[in-house]
Design a protein with these regions (language model features):
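Jelly-roll (double-stranded beta-helix
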Residues: 1-216
Length: 216
């Protein structure tokens, strides 16, 4: 909605805060459309508390070359938000958020501190890991298993129990995301691309979009 544009390359991060409204579009690069191939990425939505929902929209972009990264004992962690092994992200998330992209060699271990006030999860998208905490595991859209010290494999999501750290052991070369954030304890209404606190706010967002005032 501001006429800005940019390119995201492998490992780059774009943190968009929609705030009071922004019109945006993400699509494959024209060269990729011509040559074809495979790519993957993650689009993760963070629900801001009511006090921040109408803040000014903004983008924070961090190229891969500037992304805080730490490597230690077979573990490589890229800190998109939050902190890992003493290294912190520079992204302003407004509320406490942890988002870490981790790669582990087979047999390596990681202990990640998580604020006990946050809800945490791990999504594995390569290899397998053992999480030495009590967790519930989403193996497919309609099934959860519950237990401790479970093997989590490619495509599975582990919801973490209460505690202030996660103990992870990689049983193969693995790649996953560690995510955590606060429980807002606020009402939530969602419709289409809009996430607000009340139906009235959703209705107003649609009116603003139709009137051309959403991103003004």
């Amino acid at each position: 909605s501001e006429g800005n544009s940019g390119e995201l390359n492998p490992g780059d991060v774009q943190w968009m805060t929609a705030g009071r409204g922004i019109i945006h579009c993400e699509e494959p690069h024209e060269d990729f459309l011509k040559t074809g191939g495979r790519t993957h990425g993650f689009q993760i939505w963070v629900n801001l508390p009511a006090e921040h929902k109408m803040m000014a929209p903004r983008y924070q972009e961090v190229p891969a070359s500037e992304s805080p990264t730490v490597e230690e004992n077979g573990v490589s962690a890229r800190i998109i938000a939050g902190e890992c092994m003493g290294v912190s992200s520079s992204i302003d998330t407004k509320i406490p958020i942890t988002l870490i992209h981790v790669k582990m060699e087979k047999g390596s271990r990681l202990i990640q501190k998580i604020d006990s006030a946050l809800n945490g999860m791990i999504y594995v998208f390569g290899g397998s890991i053992i999480i030495e905490n009590k967790i519930s595991v989403k193996k497919h859209p309609m099934a959860f298993g519950l237990g401790a010290k479970q093997n989590i494999v490619d495509g599975e999501l582990a919801l973490l129990s209460e505690g202030d750290e996660i103990k992870i052991h990689s049983t193969s070369e693995s790649e996953f995301l560690i995510l955590a954030g606060p429980e807002l304890n606020e009402p939530i209404e969602r419709y289409g691309p809009f996430v607000m606190n009340t139906k009235e706010e959703i209705h107003q967002a649609f009116l603003d979009y139709q009137n051309g005032t959403l991103a003004k």
